[in-house]
Amino acid sequence: MKICIILNGEIKNYDYINSVILKGSYDYIICSDGGANHAYSMNIVPDYIIGDLDSVNGNIIEYYKSKKVKFEKFPTKKDETDTELCIELSDKLKAKEIHLIGALGGRIDHTIANINLLYYIRKRGITPKIISEKEEIYIAMDEEITIYGEIGDIISILPIKNDAKGVTLNNLEYPLED
């Protein structure tokens, strides 16, 4: 089960992101509150819109209601972010993979929080990824991952919680053996 969550962060190239979503073969598309504005701009009809709905344009809410999109409205004052609520729903839907779109840009605190959500998702046993026009962000925890790219692509490996151990990088300009 593969789920796309569209957030309210920065999306500058709607054509590119729309093609990523269409090629993603997602089982569900969920909008985290204002992410519905982005979905609307890309002519995407999500399966769910979740949050306090304080960032969604009113006419977009009405449009998606007419399209029978499922809404889950929550109070503004709550313990979880709108995106955490989307992740909880994804978990209930038995997601094996979650891709976050629109998770970067805008407020730096939101960007950092969204990157930290990768760890939160991974701890649930779900494989997460952030996708933007410029980068893809993964998290690896005691596992092997394969990243495909082209000559000239930039790859950064950053330890988040502790020192990275057992890291081997092959077929790169700067290979690494633990």
Give the residues covered by each predicted segment.
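Short phosphate-binding loop-to-helix
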Residues: 70-92
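Short Gly/Thr/Asp-enriched flexible loops that form oxyanion-binding sites at enzyme active sites
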Residues: 105, 109-119
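Short glycine-rich or small-residue beta-strand-to-loop segments that form or flank ligand, phosphate
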Residues: 72, 98-103
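Long, charged alpha-helical interface segments
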Residues: 135, 141-178
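Class I SAM-dependent methyltransferase SAM-binding "motif I" and its flanking Rossmann-like core
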Residues: 119-147
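N-terminal beta-strand-loop-alpha-helix module at the start
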Residues: 1-64
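A glycine-rich helix N-cap at a beta->alpha junction
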Residues: 70-75, 126-129, 155-158, 164
